């Protein structure tokens, strides 16, 4: 799965795969739900006004606050105001499965696969960077030892 990643500015990036485009906050990986819904003719506020959605948001908030996982203290749903391309409602990625399923079950399959692939690629890249840093540190140590032995 080839995902196109484009930086919008220091705070946001655009992820594209086939006919799906997602705007994501770089600092916390929250996803622009307003744009995702409107791309399929839906309004995120309709989903958020459902009692089951409110319960889901509250429960996810409670779970995330009790875990040690990274969690944006501002909440599960953020109203971001910055510019015309990125201002709108952003949601924790755990909600995207539910929101995209509300839009369309088939759309949800694509969105979730797309996001999981992006996250997996990100972790793989992070692992490779950590591994390269470790190798560089080892190489520096060898060079320093060699320099000490040659003095």
Swiss-Prot record:
Domain KilA-N residue range list: 11-118
Any Pfam family matching the protein: KilA-N
Alphabetic keyword roster: Early protein
Domain of life the protein comes from: Viruses
The protein's name: Uncharacterized protein FPV248
Organism of this sequence: Fowlpox virus (strain NVSL) (FPV)
């Amino acid at each position: 799965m080839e995902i196109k990643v484009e930086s919008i500015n220091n705070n946001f990036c655009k992820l594209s795969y086939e006919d799906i485009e997602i705007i994501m906050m770089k600092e916390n990986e929250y996803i622009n739900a307003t744009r995702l819904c409107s791309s399929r003719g839906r309004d995120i506020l309709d989903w958020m006004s459902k009692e089951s959605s409110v319960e889901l948001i509250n429960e996810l908030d409670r779970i995330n606050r009790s875990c040690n996982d990274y969690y944006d203290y501002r909440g599960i749903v953020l109203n971001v105001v910055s510019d015309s391309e990125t201002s709108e409602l952003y949601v924790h990625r755990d909600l995207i499965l539910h929101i995209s399923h509300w839009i369309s079950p088939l759309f949800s399959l694509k969105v979730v696969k797309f996001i999981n692939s992006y996250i997996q690629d990100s972790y793989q890249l992070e692992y490779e960077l950590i591994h390269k840093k470790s190798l560089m540190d080892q190489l520096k140590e060898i060079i320093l030892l060699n320099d000490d032995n040659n003095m």
